Regions:
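Catalytic cores of DNA base-excision repair glycosylases
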Residues: 2-215
Length: 215
């Protein structure tokens, strides 16, 4: 990833303004019907594609869409339904564990704080941020591989790790655009600013991007 300078506030505002104009209400691509099914889907999505996760969870969630039903389904049957997803054995254990803890500690409800969410098996800061944002409308920034890449390439937020990038994004994204920023950055990274062969000629922010100017 080339070394670039941080963008100015005006340039950052313009970038998110353009994202907003072409996609005013961006949505995540994981399929879910409740805070619980969202939590499970996000846990399953680690090192997996949303398409692959959705294919597995359509059947899984028909069988079990609550912590109680997931425990009744059991680890082996969970494995049967998510076998196409990477790290499926470990993820099945995490789903059983987090479901049990939700029942025991949270009255079967998905908690609404970082600390409580991260006490669940398989839930780190990124997963907690996604759940807080998508399930409860809390303005957060979850830095996945797409957000990290786009932030550094464009100079929106430069950091050596996801924590540094998250910290910079929180400081630098205009409040007007903060709630949807996570999804805009993910979608831009997934479909335009790809890891290999980014589509700079099709990019709506290319003339603002220092990485494009370096090429």
């Amino acid at each position: 990833m080339p070394l670039v300078k941080s963008l100015s506030k005006n340039s950052i505002y313009e970038i998110f303004s353009r994202f907003s104009k072409i996609n005013p209400e961006p949505k995540g691509e994981l399929e879910y019907t409740s805070a619980y099914t969202l939590l499970v889907a996000v846990v399953l999505s680690a090192q997996s594609t949303d398409i692959g996760v959705n294919k597995a969870t359509r059947k899984l969630f028909e069988l079990a869409s609550t912590p109680e039903k997931m425990l009744l389904l059991g680890e082996n049957r969970i494995i049967e339904n998510i076998r196409t997803i990477g790290l499926y054995k470990n993820k099945a254990k995490n789903i059983v564990s987090l479901s049990q803890k939700l029942i025991d500690n949270f009255n079967s409800k998905v908690p609404k704080t970082h600390r409580e969410l991260q006490s669940l098996a398989g839930v780190g800061r990124k997963t907690a941020n996604v759940v807080l944002s998508m399930a409860f409308g809390v303005p957060t920034i979850a830095v996945d591989t797409h957000v990290y890449r786009v932030s550094n390439r464009t100079g929106i937020a430069i950091g050596k790790n996801v924590d540094e990038v998250e910290e910079q994004l929180i400081k630098r994204i205009p409040k007007k655009f903060f709630f949807h920023a996570h999804h805009w950055l993910i979608l831009h990274g997934r479909y335009t600013c790809k890891a290999r062969s980014p589509l700079c000629n099709e990019c709506i922010i290319s003339e603002l991007c220092p990485s494009k100017l370096l090429n």
